[in-house]
């Protein structure tokens, strides 16, 4: 269900198209709310270049933004997100990760590779009500496709959303929910 709240960046043929999709999403968000997207792949773009924070800053000046690459191993963020996370030219690369920096100024470009945790730690966790809405959106999509049962392996917090919806009589699909070992 979380993916229904993200900006879909898949199959875009240009950075211009990506920016248009992001701009549409900004309209429905309040000031300072995070804008999160997933699926960009610069190899599919006409521009054939990696994006930078500047490509987001002019269209999202007031909201922190994080766009996850199609592979899931890199993120593209704007200046507001870097500021929220305290990432500067002096921030060292995390173990096993990299914060891309401009070779001339040393400032972060807005690309982080294998270093998503630096930014994600500053994104507020969804409330129980948020998680319930995510489940309901996913359930509606599944039912539209004729799917009446699902398997999921998510945290105890996600299970709480399923349990609450079941207690409210709103869960219409059968759910086989696995918990990660850390939640046992």
Q: How would you name each of these model-derived features?
A:
Residues 1-184:
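Divalent metal-binding segments
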């Amino acid at each position: 269900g979380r993916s229904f709240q993200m900006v879909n960046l898949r199959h875009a043929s240009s950075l211009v198209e990506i920016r248009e999709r992001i701009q549409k999403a900004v309209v429905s968000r309040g000031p300072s709310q995070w804008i999160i997207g997933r699926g960009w792949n610069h190899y599919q773009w006409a521009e054939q270049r990696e994006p930078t924070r500047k490509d987001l800053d002019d269209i999202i000046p007031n909201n922190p933004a994080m766009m996850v690459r199609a592979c899931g191993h890199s993120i593209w963020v704007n200046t507001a997100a870097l500021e929220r996370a305290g990432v500067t030219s002096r921030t060292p690369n995390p173990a096993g990760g990299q914060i891309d920096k401009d070779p001339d100024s040393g400032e972060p470009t807005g690309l982080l590779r294998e270093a998503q945790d630096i930014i994600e730690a500053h994104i507020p966790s969804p409330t129980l009500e948020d998680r319930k809405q995510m489940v309901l959106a996913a359930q509606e999509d599944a039912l539209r496709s004729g799917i009446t049962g699902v398997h999921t392996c998510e945290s105890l917090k996600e299970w709480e959303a399923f349990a609450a919806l079941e207690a409210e009589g709103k869960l219409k699909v059968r759910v086989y929910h696995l918990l990660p070992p850390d939640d046992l």
